[in-house]
Amino acid sequence: MANLKNLSKKSKSQSMGMHAEVLKGRTQQRFFDSEEAENFYYFGNFDVDFNKRTELDVKNMEAPQANKKIDELMSQGYGTIVIKNPQGKHSLGVGILNKLNLIFEGSLGYFGVGSCDGLTARITGRVGWSCAQNLMAGKVVVEKNAGSSFGAAIRGGDLICKGSVGARTGIDMKGGTIIVGGDAGAFTGFMMQRGRIIVLGNVGINLGDSMYDGTIFVGGKIGSFGSDAVTSDLTSSDKDWLKRKLKVAEINENFDVSKMKKIVAGKKLWNYDNLEPTEKKGAI
């Protein structure tokens, strides 16, 4: 079990393995920076060696049994675990609050690798609804397509789908980055509060509907804009950031980012209580 580091008497929440949030307005939430992340541990975390690798066949296991076995392997110091025969099971790899390389050889069902912090996961097949929901930090890569609500309520980390994703991708996201190599469905970025979404292909109707903050970049066609979603000028820093992200994500590094459209919140929802009745109707 890892020792807790950098604990402060001023923060009992740290000793309980909780994140400290600095709130600015309703949208700005900082959990920890990259330097703090190296020294951050949840209570009960395991010291794992990424070079220590093993395989786990879950063909005849239910999800709770498989997740418990993953926890047991981490307790033995395994830092890289290859999951064989996931066969579209729901809720595999959820709730992992530990640094770990997790490779799924196949497809996942609903809620795969949800509520994780510090996990690096790769899924060679497809994923169902709500993959990586509430991701706090880490990296999740889906090699094929993803279902609806991809990355719902994520707060940090990188979530990558090399194929296409369903409706409501990034719904209620509060941080982090979602990268889609193909198309995205309707209501992408619905009610997003912070973070960034990159879609290289087309997006469906009501893009960014009711978004409060955050940024969406689209390389293809847009079905329609949602309420309070507006276009903004693409800056040189935006282009540099997009190039870096696509390179790290290993998705179409030669994509011409200068042709991408940038969508942000029009900020009407920030001042909703001060709007006239006719303006309120147009803001929601």
Language model segments and positions:
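Intrinsically disordered, low-complexity terminal regions
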Residues: M1-N85, S91-L92, Q193-L200, G204-I284
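Beta-strand repeat architectures
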Residues: I70-T80, S91-L100, F111-L119, S130-A137, ...
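Feature marks extracellular polysaccharide-active and adherence modules
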Residues: K84-P86, G95, E105-S107, G114-S115, ...
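Extracellular/lumenal glycan-associated surfaces
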Residues: N98-S107, L119-T120, G138, G157-D158, ...
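Acidic, glycine-rich active-site loops and adjacent beta-strand->loop/helix elements
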Residues: A146, V165, A184
